[in-house]
């Protein structure tokens, strides 16, 4: 292959961490050579991942300015497992609730 592999399985689940979260949805995302997968917006998600060099921890997970969410604790955990530019990656992030997840300015976990 001309390109190192960049393929991920992304999940969204109810729970405080990946080990205990009940997975609600899962999609695939492959970014090389062209964006594909079951993710609803693969081109946009791959562009965001390319912008941070595949370092999922650098994606902005805070709410966009002006977005209001309640402080209720109903944790939503997102995960990414797979390979980016030929390197194995494993990522998880927990949002306080679904509003905070949806308020984050990233499409990677919008599915």
UniProtKB/Swiss-Prot annotation:
Keywords: Disulfide bond, Protease inhibitor, Secreted, Serine protease inhibitor. It is found in: Secreted. The record marks 71-72 as: Reactive bond. PROSITE patterns: SSI (PS00999). It comes from the Bacteria. GO terms for cellular component: extracellular region. The keyword Repeat does not apply. InterPro entries: Prot_inh_I16_SSI, Prot_inh_SSI_I16_CS, Subtilisin_inhibitor, Subtilisin_inhibitor-like_sf. The keyword Cell division does not apply. GO terms for molecular function: serine-type endopeptidase inhibitor activity. Disulfide bonds join 31-46, 69-99. Coiled coil: none annotated. Belongs to the protease inhibitor I16 (SSI) family. Strong inhibitory activity toward subtilisin BPN' and, to a lesser extent, toward trypsin. Homodimer. This is Subtilisin inhibitor-like protein 12. It comes from Streptomyces hygroscopicus.
